[in-house]
Amino acid sequence: MARLARLRRWTARVACGGAVVIAGVVHVPAALAFPYRADFGSTTVLSEQPIDRAAMGRVLARADGLLATSPLYRTGLSRQVVLTDGGWRWDVLSIGVRNAIAFRRPFAHALVFNRSSVATDRVTNGAPLGGVRTLSGTIAHETTHRLVADHIGEWAALRLPAWKREGYPDYVAGETSIRPGDEALIRRLDPTAPVLTYYEGRRRVAAELARNGGSVDALLKD
């Protein structure tokens, strides 16, 4: 019995230690030793492929131009842009959100992207419908999540209804992953497809901002 108790304690410690390691990695992507790194002012880019500084600079400039349309934007925001090939590093980092095009973990400064192409300014999760966005627009989208969280608090941001939580970042990005001609097809195939939350949310946010005189503070109230 004593040996069994020791084994259980050892197993629990290993499981706890493994959970701590995983939690650390998903919040600190640099722990996965990305082979390429480049700094652009207060933005650090980690990548699985060589980084074309000129092309990446254009992508970031477009993203920041989109962000500048939001009253929440501030220059010099520290962030980490993590570009993957959709392989094992993505699988490790994206636990719980593996089908996403990109994501930001709460309380984290890292923005993590699925299969990315800097040269073409594209990022995809491989879905045949609603699976492609501009990389620059998606950087703007994920950075907006950070701006909202900084403005109203992480927990308040998480409690926002989905149409506000995802709709405002898409409004700032000026895009969703659904082409207008694909909306009807997606609704026929799956009326509850998560991608529709973004599409509908952006339209609702645009309508609400038009109604309230453009007040983002009013929009972000619960």
Please provide the spans of the model-predicted regions.
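Surface-exposed patches in mature extracellular/periplasmic domains of secreted proteins
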Residues: 67-83, 154-160, 182-186, 216-221
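Pan-zinc metallopeptidase signature
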Residues: 12-17, 21-35, 194-222
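Post-HExxH zinc-binding segment in Zn-dependent metallohydrolases
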Residues: 151, 158-193
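Short pre-active-site segment immediately N-terminal to the catalytic Zn-binding motif
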Residues: 118-139, 154-160
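Active-site recognition of the HExxH zinc-binding catalytic motif
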Residues: 137-150, 169-170
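N-terminal low-structure segments adjacent to metalloprotease catalytic domains
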Residues: 1-58
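Auxiliary, metal-adjacent structural segments of Zn-dependent hydrolase domains
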Residues: 58-117, 132
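Extracytoplasmic/secreted envelope proteins and their assembly/folding machinery
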Residues: 57-64, 140, 166, 170, ...
